[in-house]
Amino acid sequence: MYQLNVPLKNDAHTIFIEQGISQKLTSLLNENKDYSHIFIITQQSILDHVDTSFLSDFPIIIIGEKETSKSIGSAESVVQQLIVSGCDRDSLLVGFGGGTVTDLVGFVSSIFMRGINHVFVPTTLLGMVDSAIGGKTAVNSSSARNVIGTFKQPRAIYIDPLFLTTLPSREIIDGFAEIIKYGLIVDCDLYNMIESDFQTLIDLKDLSQIESIIQACCQHKVNFVIADELDQNQRMMLNFGHTLGHALESYFNYKTITHGQAVYYGMLGAAFISKKYNFLSEDAFNRIHAFISTIPKLNFNNIDCNKVFECIKYDKKKTKNKFNFIVLTDIGKADIFYKITSDDFKEAINYIANYEYSCN
């Protein structure tokens, strides 16, 4: 079993990665005899597609399937179910699912009785390499993504790569958006490997190789979290592609575009701005452009660029009327750019809207 320690001063915990670790979950959770109750919070689709016999000892709370379920209303619904079920400050919440589940469970954990413990068992690739790690919790408002949230570290994270074999290929491709992000901002070797063997990787032909990639991404995320837990400086690098990506998700009302697709488009737009200001060379930009163009995408023929820009105005990374925008200086290197203008955003959105996408 691979173990990655997260040595935060007040909230140290461990990430456990192993194929089949989910089958040990009951014994792992019961190792701590101090928990009065253990509650599993998940989605029905996960219960329908994953062997969850190992969860039979615990009560289960079901939340909605869509990104729109990540809301204050959903959080209140979970809180009410916890109250009725006798949850107290010595209870443990288990977020079993993808990013929607872990974001919501982390948020509920941080506010219920002013904070109780939680652990994560991510079932999606995106969750395993990104959203379950780092302590950010969030729900969406009616107009913007992730603008209501807290910081609350989990007590542990249990990652079972075998869950990936239950996912449709679209979700694997979506998860690779975050992996490619790590490659672009901090790990050129990782990017080179993905670029050269992308189809084999998304087909999950070698799950041990995928497990190694997950380990590398977890280490990168942990490094950023240790350096900047509260997202004031270096951790902002992880937002590469997300300012534009979140705006697209909001524009489409979280319905016709997935988070992974939005991040792919957002990274293209961010690379475009990086090239515009000569942070990124033409050759590097063309290489990124060519690679991402091979990934199935949506048709944006009728996108309203001005309305997408309006969505950017609500981005949580905005401070004092400035955006902390992440640019690439090379493949594997990034920096924070503070002088981005509204015209830059509009040009990038227009570039995305008019990009020649070809679906595989």
Language-model region placement:
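ATP/NTP phosphate-donor binding region
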Residues: 1-92
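A glycine/threonine-rich phosphate-anchoring loop and its flanking beta-alpha core
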Residues: 16, 107-199
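Non-catalytic interfacial helical region
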Residues: 77-96, 105-120
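Short glycine/serine/threonine-rich phosphate/pyrophosphate-binding segments
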Residues: 100-107, 128, 247
